[in-house]
Amino acid sequence: LETLLATLRVADGFESTRNDRTRQAQSVIVKTAEDYAMAQPGDRLYVTDLCKVARVSERTLEYAFKEIMGLSPVTYLSRLRLHRVRQALLAATHGSTTVTTEALNWGFWHFGEFSRAYKECFGELPSETLRRKP
């Protein structure tokens, strides 16, 4: 019995080490993808771009993002674009842009869905952000 317990403890330690290595690898994948995404200036960024830069499959990227960030790469990219719209709206001077222009600039084509997602993310409509300066 003691030999069995000792063997199980060693196996448990091996499993923990393997899980730690997996989590470290996932962290590197997410960091690589995130650094790349943050460095890209435009809206034309796709999950396949993140896969290429991280040198992993879509499935591996999906698992890594869900494990490390708690969301999918698609959701991450959408939120990144929402934040970039918000930055543009906050930086705008009176009359220099519109919500529609900025939404289109960042690849949002369905304005109702865009407004809903924006409000869910920031607690206000994009038009309110444009009117209000921090």
Protein language model features and the residues they cover:
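A short His-aromatic
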Residues: A64
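DNA-recognition helix of C2H2 zinc fingers
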Residues: S115
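Generic hydrophobic, amphipathic alpha-helix propensity
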Residues: Q26-V30, L77-L82
